[in-house]
């Protein structure tokens, strides 16, 4: 009974979080409607073949041919049997709440656990949870369908809470939280977010080290570090299956280093990703003010005409143009919304820089500054280059603007440390805080500054800036039309362009200044509440409640701009993202076991609708196989353009298209159908008579020394009768034998991870398969293992002897079984350590 009474207030806070999460998504969550997300729908299209196979066999294949000619599923459906335990723990943690609702609930609960680890009172911890959880970016990524990122971010605060507890001497609970949430965090499978938060962990550990050195408590520091390290290692090993195969896949994906020596080598990083690609989404330097004023750059890249309030200032003559122009005018290619952490939160953060003392403040400030500087990417390139070239793994991640998740953590945390000190300091306004003013006679001199002065200064630096921006917007932000927009509008006659630009600036200035005033009044209201509490005109608990309501309403309203009820659809709309068309039905009448489809009526390499029904040449995935991407750049994309022109010229008569010369690479990929666009949004499927089929013998195999030679040789070969391979595969493939027209290869059985063929040849030789090569594919000929080689830059090949043979290609990596065994062992060790720790703690308390 005492235990229940002790934890009842915490349980009530948890219940409050669930109510808030439900309320945000009301009424959609009660009506059964769900979000239609691009990334989630794309994932459904890419994963349809996996789903069908799993439902039919109960086994999860590690390969799919649904997109990009074929690729591993390690970063599409990273599901392993060892994760079922973690899945159960995760569901318990978020109380089996429905989709979307539990994301917000987990945000709130995670930061609450962190602040309780920092020894915050419950009401302050609940307030702090709102400040972190309702940061705009966290809701924007829910709307976008970046669910792995959502889950990873939700588990990071409680993971850090374990570290905090350990360094505060609470080793058992520190071990439990660190181990458990490290495992859950890694299972979320968003390495980029985990990697970014390790910067926070690094700075915090340094802060604890400095504190330990000052207090001469290095033994305690070492013990806490060991506890965290062991717990983290167990959490990592529990996820070894996922981590190992992610690492393995990274080496072969766009995130790994290319074997090509590119002409523009300076633009290439050690990871293989180009600097331009990594920094394409870089936050603007002046765009950083969105932390304080969300519409500093207009918000999201949605049509300007959708903003009814702003369109009140629009010249009706330009209305059609405003339907094409975006509301966002920053220098990113596009955005789903800004990073806004709350106006009053920023005041508390600035106040914390002045009144919070100790190494932790400097750790949080350093992490914040680093986050902002790195988010600028190409706008602060010399600094970005330092990290790309010298910081391990940093160059493996694109969209550098997303590193602002660090600032979104450190700003509310320091803000809450400031508020905690304000409310817990007796007569705070009359008190002082020392200010380091500089050296005097070789000694540092501190000057005592009244706390009310720090509060006033913080108000001026935040609310004052909002007023200055609102009154003089063009002084601080001269550009309200981006350079890209100016280039796009350059074709408009000058007599129309000048008034258009003037009116566009007027509209956007009104959008910006309205939000400036909004942020000002939020800060003003929060400051008034705080001052009333400090003057004892308002009880602290009521002040906290009012600040809770103020910050929740402020950030709720901003988030509703980017994640609102209008975005929810009936479940059936998302569950079947691509309705079967007449074109699909016509292609599906082909009962051949395996062939590919090229959709020229869509954005071929940015959609998975085609993959839902067919095995696509294109697709959508953030980390496709690197060699396939290089083949796209060098051959597939140009051949697509040539195919469009040739087919149009032949008026759709494929027999009149010189397919062998126009698109040989598409032919070797067994592109049997090409979907062409028609007027009125209709499409038509055209059968390609030149596709090479599932496999064929080649008469000649040329060996080369490197990737550049291999890729270049493709254009010089008759790919139906010749092939090129890296010389490292010579032992596996041997020499090709000229065939005499009687060699036959038939596909007998198709599964995503197993292909069975009958091969007949009087001479034997090298068989090329129209299947994408990847380490881990194995082959047997009449039940005996043979080595699989790589030809034509991306395809599989084997050497067979004369006669008739049964060939089986299989993708069932032995590494899955090995890593699963290690994961179960780690589970056992973690469970034993937790049980032992709890028993030890109970005995210690009794003694």
PLM regions and their residue ranges:
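Transmembrane-helix signature of polytopic, membrane-embedded enzymes
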Residues: 115-134, 172-175
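Transmembrane signal-anchor helices characteristic of membrane glycosylation enzymes that use polyprenol
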Residues: 10-46, 231-245, 370-374, 466-471, ...
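Contiguous transmembrane helix-bundle modules in multi-pass membrane proteins
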Residues: 129, 145-156, 166-183, 191-193, ...
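Active-site-proximal, structured, solvent-exposed surfaces of multi-pass membrane proteins
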Residues: 347, 672, 681, 721-847
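Hydrophobic alpha-helical transmembrane segments
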Residues: 97-111, 337-352, 407-416, 518-527
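Membrane-interface coil-to-helix junctions
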Residues: 20-114, 130-153, 267-341, 374-384, ...
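Polar, glycine-rich mid-to-C-terminal structural blocks
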Residues: 223-283
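Extracytoplasmic/lumenal acceptor-recognition loop(s) of multi-pass membrane glycoenzymes
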Residues: 54, 65, 69-72, 78-79, ...
